[in-house]
Amino acid sequence: MATISASLLRAPAQLRAAHRAAAPVARNLTVRAMGKEVVATDKAPAALGPYSQAIKAGNPLYVSGQIGLIPGEGKFAGDTIEEQTEQVMKNMGAILEEAGADFSKVVKTTILLADMDDFKTVNEIYGARFPANPPARATFAVKTLPLNALVEIDCTAYLD
């Protein structure tokens, strides 16, 4: 469910229509709007729907779920859990970098797996990015992921 600011709800109908029709955020751009900054980079895949790659809201950075797509190509890095997890972590790293952060700033992640049997393999690849003080985390097995991905990971990071 979308959240609309109170000021936008009070705006004339034409302004609300113009807001809805606004062009998508340009790539490699940080845009300030309504107290938040949209973070976007072409070094990670474009969002598959009406959401941002990441949002800065004060010091927290919220990175949307990443799947193993190769940026600019729209295809998976491979068919294996290893290939897709490596690409997920590359995509997440690119978004963190665009926002001025890195994996050491990540405080929480959520991992979605198409098959819980991949838990150990994902942990090995994931753990290489967090060798000390890993973030809090939840992991779930789900029925289906976007584009039939094998893994999706989102994160929250803290910015200095």
Question: Model regions: which residues?
Answer:
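Short, polar/acidic, helix-capping and beta-turn segments at strand->helix junctions
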Residues: 2-160
